[in-house]
Amino acid sequence: MASSTAAVPFLAPPLEQLRHLAEELRSLLPRVRVGEAQETAEEFNREMFWRRLNEAAVKVNGEATVLTTHFSKLPWPSPQETQRICEQVRIAIEEIIIVYYSLPKDQGITLRKLVRNAALDIVDGMAQLLEVLLTAPSQSTENGDLISCNSVSVACQQVPEIPKDNKAAALLMLTKSVDFVKDAHEEMEQAVEECDPYSGLLNDSEDNSDSHSDEDGVLGLPSNRDSYWSEEDQELIIPCLALVRASRASLKKIRILVAENGKKDEVAQLDDIVDISDEISPSVDDLVLSIYPPVCHLTVRISSAKLVSVLIKALEITKASHVSPHPGDSWIPLLINAVDHCMNRIKALTQRAAEL
C-alpha cells in the first residue's frame, strides 16, 4: 500500500544552491552579450522603459543586500529559506535582462550597448557576490565590508546615470575617446620632452642594479642600448606626435559637431560616427607603443598607416552626416591634409625599413 505521506522534495545544502546560482548567472552572460532586441508591434515608450530599468536595478540591489545579510556569517539560512532567496535573485536578474531586450535597435546601437553593458555588469556583479559569499563565513567577512564593496551594488547605482537617448550616448562615448587619446598624447609628449621614455621604470630598477643586473632579460626590462632613441628615431617621432595631435583635434571637433548639430532621431548616422571614432583610440595606442625603444621603423609605418586610415574615414563619415550642415567648411579638408602630410613624412623616414 502506497504511503499517504507526501514526499518531501530534496533541497541541496545552502552552499550548493549558491554555487549553482553563481554558475547559472555566469552562463547567462554570453546570451546577454549577443541577445537581440525583442520584436514587438507596440510603440516604444521611452519613459516606461527607463522606469522599468531603474526599478529592476533597485530590485537587484535589494536582493544583493538580502544575500549579504543572510550569508556573510554563520549560521546560514535553512535550505528552504536559501531556495526562496535564490529564486528572488533569479527573478530580479531575469527582469533586468528582459527590460534590456525590450529596447529596440531603432533607438540606437550605441544606446543599446550602454544598456547591455550595464546589464552585463549587474549579472556579473551578482555572480561575483555569490562567489565571495561562498567563502565569507570562513574568512569572518564583515557585513559592512561586503555591502560597501560588492560590485553589483555599484553597477545598479550606475543605471540612473545611463544616457537616455542615442545622441547623449554618442556624446558619452566620444568624450571617452577624446579622454583616452588626450592621455596617450600627453604621455607621448612627456616622453619626447624628457628624451627618456623609460625614465620611471629604469630609475626604479637602477637602485637595485647590483643585485639584479643579470635579471633584466628575464624581467623584460630594456637593456641600456635599447632604452633610448637614436637620432633617426627622434626624427621619426616628430611626425608621429603630430599625427597623434591631429587625432586628438579630430575627435574633439567631431564631438563638438555632434553636441551642436546632432539629432536624436538620426540614430544610424550617430552610430556610424561613434563606431569609427571608437577605432581611433586603439590605433593611437598602437602607434604610441611602437615608438618606444627599441623602435622598429616598419612597425611605426604600419601603425601610422592604420591610424591614418581610421582618421580619414572618421572625418569623411562625419563630413557626410547631418552633424556637418556645411560640408564645405575648411576644417575637415585641413585636418585630412595635415594627416596626409604626417603620413608622407613617416613614409619617407621609414622607406628603407619597408624595402628590407
Swiss-Prot record:
The tissues in which it is expressed are: Expressed at high levels in brain, intestine, muscle and ovary and at lower levels in heart, kidney, liver, lung, spleen and testis.
Which keywords belong to this entry?
Answer: Acetylation, Cell cycle, Cytoplasm, Nucleus, Phosphoprotein
Q: Where is the stretch described as Required for interaction with CCND1?
A: 2-205
Induction section of the entry: Expression is induced by partial hepatectomy.
Localisation per UniProt entry: Cytoplasm; Nucleus
Q: Where is this region: Interaction with TCF3?
A: 2-181, 147-356
Name the segments for region: Disordered: 198-224
Quaternary organization: Interacts with CCND1 and GRAP2. May also interact with COPS5, RPLP0, SIRT6, SYF2 and TCF3.
**What's the protein called, per UniProt?**
Cyclin-D1-binding protein 1
**Natural source organism:** Mus musculus (Mouse)
What is the name of the gene encoding this protein? Ccndbp1
